[in-house]
UniProtKB/Swiss-Prot annotation:
Organism superkingdom: Bacteria
Enzyme class: ligase
Stated role: DNA ligase that catalyzes the formation of phosphodiester linkages between 5'-phosphoryl and 3'-hydroxyl groups in double-stranded DNA using NAD as a coenzyme and as the energy source for the reaction. It is essential for DNA replication and repair of damaged DNA.
Name of the protein this chain belongs to: DNA ligase
Family: Belongs to the NAD-dependent DNA ligase family. LigA subfamily.
Amino acid sequence: MKEFKFNDEQLSTIQELEVDIDLKKLEIAISKESIDELSEDELLALLKVTNALYRSGFPVIEDILYDSFWNKFALNHPNHPFITSVETEVLNLGKTVALPQKMLSTDKAYSKEEIKKWLDRILKAAEELDIDTNEIEIRITPKLDGYAAFDDGERLYTRGDGVKGQDVSRAFERGLKVVRNSERGLGAGEIVINKAYFEKKLSQYFENSRNIQAAIIAEKNVDERVLEAIKEGACVFHPFAVLPNWTGNYQDLMTDFDGIIEQVWNSVEYDVDGVILEATDTRIKEHMGANRKFHRWQIAFKINDEVAEVEVISVTPQTSRTGRVTPVAELVPTRISGAMISRVTVHHYNMVKINGVGPGAIVQIVRSGLVIPKIEKVIKPVDPQMPELCPSCKSHLLWESDHLVCPNKSDCPAQTENTLVHFFKTLANNDGFGPKNIEKLANLGVKHIHQMYDLKPHQFAMYGFGEKTSKNLYDQLQASKNIEIEDWRFLSAFGVSRLGGGNCEKLLQHYSLRELFEATVEDIAELNGFARVSAEAIVKGLANIKEEFFKVYDLGFNLSITPKQSELESLASPLTGKIVVFTGKMLQGKRSDMEKHAKALGAKVGTSVTSNTTYLIAGLKVGETKINDAKEKGVKVLSEQEYLDLIS
Ligand SMILES: NC(=O)c1ccc[n+]([C@@H]2O[C@H](COP(=O)([O-])OP(=O)(O)OC[C@H]3O[C@@H](n4cnc5c(N)ncnc54)[C@H](O)[C@@H]3O)[C@@H](O)[C@H]2O)c1
Ligand SMILES: [Zn+2]
C-alpha cells in the first residue's frame, strides 16, 4: 500500500476551501481508498478537498473512487447542496453572472450494463410517448476533458455552479478561436489543447493542460508560450455541437458497442475522459427532463484505467508467422478492470533485454477498460534470460534490429502453422479452419497450404476428425476455391511482410499475379506509394513464397482480377465529371436507378437545371417550357434514347 500525503501546493489549495478537518484522517482514507473510518462530515470534507484538487489539475484519487464516495454521501444526504448542484470550479475571479442557460453535469456509467439500463429508460420514455423505439436516435460524442465554458455569441462564461458562472470573455480577446474557425454562439463546450502540441511544446513547462486552460481565462499575464499555442490554433474553444459523433438507434449501438465507443473515443486530438451518450429527440428530452445535477436523457460513459504491480513468473518465447519471436510475460494472475490477467506480451526481445524483464521482475500493468493490458513500466528489473533457439524448431535465433528471428522459413512448425491460420483467416470464405483444427492437422504433418488442399475426406478422418466433420472440412476447402475472391486478397493471404490487402491491391493495379513475381525492386519502387526498402522486402518476400504460391494458385481458385490502372483511365465514361438532370417518366426503368447508374459512371446528378448542368435527360410528359428553359441556359437536352446511346 502506498502512503499518501498532501504536498505543499495541495495544502494551499485546501486552505482556501476553509474546511475544518483533521487532514491526517483524510490522508489515511486516501491511502486506504476507504471511507469506513470517516464520519459524514469528514466524508463531505473529503469530497470537497478531492474535488478542489481535481479542478486545480492535481487529482489525488481515481474518478471511479471519487464517484463511489460521492454516491455513498448522496445516499444519506440526497438533498444536500453538494449533491444537488454541480461541483463548483475552484477558480475564483470575483463577481458571478447568471448563465444564459443552465449548465449541468452528467450522470455517469462505468459499465455496459449501466449504459443498457440507461438505454432502457430512454426506450421506456419512447413507449410512453408512443414513439417507435427503432426511431430513437442516440448520439455519441467524445467527452472532452478540458475547461467547461458557455459561448452565447457575445460572452464566454465558466460553468460555475451551473446557474451562475463567471464572465471570461477575455479568453476570446486573447485570440482564442472556436475550433476550425466555426462561428461564435454555439453554446456549451470546453477549452481544450491539442495533445500532440502539448507534448511537444508545452509539457516541459506545464504539468498538465488544465493549468494552461485556467491561465487563459484567469491570469492577468498569460505565458507567451500559451499565447503562441492559441495563435497556432492548438488551443481552442470546442463547442459540443460541432464534435465528431456517431448516431444510430439502440440496435445499431448494441451490434458493435465496444467498437463504436472506441471509435468515438479516439475521434479527437484532445484529452478525452469518456464518451457522452444522449437521446436527440426533443420529445424524449422534454419528457425525461433533468434533476438539479444532470439531464436524464444524457449519460457519460467512463472507463477506469486500472493499474497493478505484478510479478513476472517467466517469459515465454513464441514464434510468429514471420519468424519473429515474441516474448510473452507469464504473470502471477491478477484481477484488473474486472478481468483476470495472467499474461501480457512484451513487444520484442530488445525490450526484454534493456528493461530486465524476467522471472521475479515486478512490472506495472495498465488496462484501460476494454483495451488489452500492457506493461507500463518495469518497477523491479532482473537479469533477463535470452533464448538462443527457436522454441518451435530449435534453429539458432538471429537478431534483426529489435527482434530475435527464427531463420528457418520453410520448416519451422510455428511459422508454417501460423501461416496456415493466416491464410484461411484472410480468405474468410470458409468455416472449419481456425487455429484449433489447424494445430491438430499441423501436428500430424500438414505443413503447407497446398498439402491442406490435397486432403480427401477419409484422410481428415485418419487425422482423428469425425466422419461428418471430415466431410464438412473437405466441402469447405472446395468451397473456398469456388467462391469468387479478389486476387489481391488471395495474395495477401500468403502473409508476406508488407503485402497486406492495400499494398496487394495497389500492385495488382499494375501487374498481373504472374507478372508481379517477375517484377524487380526498381519496378516496384517506381510505383506511387512504395519506398525502396518496401520494394526490397516485397521482392524478397515474393521470392520466398513463389514455389508454394504457384502450387496453390494452380489449384484453380476463382479469382476476380483487380482492374488495371491503365484500363481504369481509358475507361473514363462520357459522363465523367458531367452534371446531369433527369426529368419526366423513363421507359427503361425507374428514374432513381438511372440516377444511380449515372453516378456510377462518374456523373453528378442534379435535381434542377442550372447553367452548370451538362445534360437534361427528358423522359415522357415533360413540359415545353422546361425544355426551352434548359436550352436557354445552354444545357443540352437529350431524349432517353439519345442518352442511352451516349453511355452505351
Ligand atoms: N478524481 C477526483 O478526485 C475527482 C474529483 C471531483 C470530480 N471528479 C470527476 O468529475 C466528475 C464531476 O465533474 P463534472 O460535474 O465536471 O462532470 P464531468 O466532467 O464528469 O462531466 C460533465 C461535463 O462534461 C462536459 N462535456 C465534455 N464533453 C461533452 C460532450 N461531448 N457533451 C456534453 N458534455 C460534455 C460538460 O462540460 C459537462 O458539464 C465526477 O463524477 C468525477 O468523475 C473526480
Ligand atoms: Zn523456428
